[in-house]
Amino acid sequence: MVNRISILGSTGSIGVQTLDVARNLNIKVDGLAANKNIDLLEKQAREFQPKIVAVKDEERARILRDRLSDTDCKVVGGVEGLKMVASIETVETVVTSIVGIAGLIPTMEAIKHKKNIALANKETLVTAGHIVMSEAARMGVKILPVDSEHSAVFQSLMGNNKKDVAKIILTASGGPFRGRKKEELRNVTLREALNHPNWSMGSKITIDSATMMNKGLEVIEAHWLFEIPQDDIEVLVHPQSIIHSMVEYKDGSIIAQLGSPDMRLPIQFALTYPDRKQNNFSKLDIVKIGSLTFEAPDLEAFPCLGLAFEALRAGGTMPAVLNAANEKAVGLFLQEKIRFLDIPEIIEKVMGRHSVKPDPDIDDIIDVDLWARKIVEEIVK
C-alpha cells in the first residue's frame, strides 16, 4: 500500500473519490492539481495540507495563492505547475485523473521521476501508449489501472500466465441510450445524454459513455496496458455494470471481477495493490440483483466504438486524431452547438483527412492533436 500520493485532477469526479479513499486509508496527499475549480481546490488544500497545489489556469493560480497565503501550501500555475505536482520527491504514486490529452505531459513527468502511476486518464495511453508503456518499463514504473474495466482485467490476470490468455472481454453498460436505433438518437438532448443509468462521472466521460466512444478508448487503452492484440479484445454490453470485465483463457475458462458500480473500489485497489483493505463502501448483494445479462453492441447506432477499432488498426497518430476530434466534438455537444449524431460523423470525417505517421513522438502527437481540433472547427463552421 502507498503512503504518499499526488492527484492530478483532484477536483474532478475521480479526484474527489480518490480523496475519499485517501481519507479512509489515512494516505498522505502531498500534491493536488486542478484545471480551474479553485473553490473546491482551496477546500481540499485546507483539509489535506499538501506541499504543492497547482492550477493549470495561471490567473486562477494567482487568486488561489492569495487565498492560501495563511497555509504552508506552495501554489503554482500552468503546465509547469502540473509537472511539479507530478514529481514531488516524497510521493510514491501519482493518480492521473486529468480529463483528456492534457494528462499526457504531467504523466510522462511522473514516470521520468520514477513515480508509480494510478491511471485514470485513458487518453494518455490512447494517444501515446507506445511511448508511455516503453518509458514506464525503462524506468521500472508500475502503471496501475483505475478505470473499473481495466482494474477488473488486471485483477482477472493476477496469478495467471499472460501467454494463456485467449481474449479480454470489456463490459459496457450501454449508456442511457442502450437499445435505441440510430434513427431514435437523431434528436436526443444533452440532458438525456448526461443521464447515465449506473455511474456518477464527469460530463465528458458521461457523453463518451452515451456514444460508446468511452468503450472504444478503453479498447485502445487495454491494447497497450495488457499487450493484447486488438483482435483479442471483445466488447459486450452488460446493463447491470456488476461484472466490470473478464479474461477468457485458452482452456475456455473465464475469470471475471464483480463489484458494485462504485469507482472508489478500483481507485482503492490501485492504491493498496497488492493488498486489499477494509472499507465502508456498500457491498454487492448478488441475490438482490437477481440476474446478469449480456448483449452485443450495436455498431450501427453507436459507430464511435467501430471508429476506435479502426483507429487502433491504423496505428501511429490515428488514435490521437480520434481522441482529439472526439474531445472537440463532445465539447461542442456539451455547449449544444452540434447534435448527438454529429459526434461520430465529425470524428469519421477528421480521420478520413488524416495521413498516419507510423511511429510518432510526443511532439508529433501534440501536433496532430491541434490539427484534428482545427479540422473539427472547420467542419462545424
From Swiss-Prot:
Molecular functions per Gene Ontology: 1-deoxy-D-xylulose-5-phosphate reductoisomerase activity; manganese ion binding; NADPH binding
Alphabetized SUPFAM superfamilies for the sequence: 1-deoxy-D-xylulose-5-phosphate reductoisomerase, C-terminal domain, Glyceraldehyde-3-phosphate dehydrogenase-like, C-terminal domain, NAD(P)-binding Rossmann-fold domains
Organism: Acetivibrio thermocellus (strain ATCC 27405 / DSM 1237 / JCM 9322 / NBRC 103400 / NCIMB 10682 / NRRL B-4536 / VPI 7372) (Clostridium thermocellum)
Stored Pfam families: DXP_redisom_C (PF08436), DXP_reductoisom (PF02670), DXPR_C (PF13288)
EC numbers, comma separated: 1.1.1.267
Keyword line: Isoprene biosynthesis, Manganese, Metal-binding, NADP, Oxidoreductase
Pathway(s): Isoprenoid biosynthesis; isopentenyl diphosphate biosynthesis via DXP pathway; isopentenyl diphosphate from 1-deoxy-D-xylulose 5-phosphate: step 1/6
Binding site for NADPH: T11, G12, S13, I14, K36, N37, N121, E123, G202
Keyword Manganese attached: yes
Signal peptide: none
Group of enzyme by EC: oxidoreductase
Lineage: Bacteria, Bacillati, Bacillota, Clostridia, Eubacteriales
Descriptive protein name: 1-deoxy-D-xylulose 5-phosphate reductoisomerase
Reaction(s) catalysed (UniProt annotation): 2-C-methyl-D-erythritol 4-phosphate + NADP(+) = 1-deoxy-D-xylulose 5-phosphate + NADPH + H(+)
Keyword Zinc-finger belongs to the record: no
Family: Belongs to the DXR family.
Functional summary from the UniProt entry: Catalyzes the NADPH-dependent rearrangement and reduction of 1-deoxy-D-xylulose-5-phosphate (DXP) to 2-C-methyl-D-erythritol 4-phosphate (MEP).
InterPro entries tied to this protein: DXP_reductoisomerase, DXP_reductoisomerase_C, DXP_reductoisomerase_N, DXPR_C, DXPR_C_sf, NAD(P)-bd_dom_sf
Required co-factors: Mg(2+); Mn(2+)
A GO BP annotation: isopentenyl diphosphate biosynthetic process, methylerythritol 4-phosphate pathway involved in terpenoid biosynthetic process
Residues that hold Mn(2+) according to the record: D147, E149, E218
UniProt-annotated binding residues for 1-deoxy-D-xylulose 5-phosphate: K122, S148, E149, S173, H196, S209, N214, K215, E218
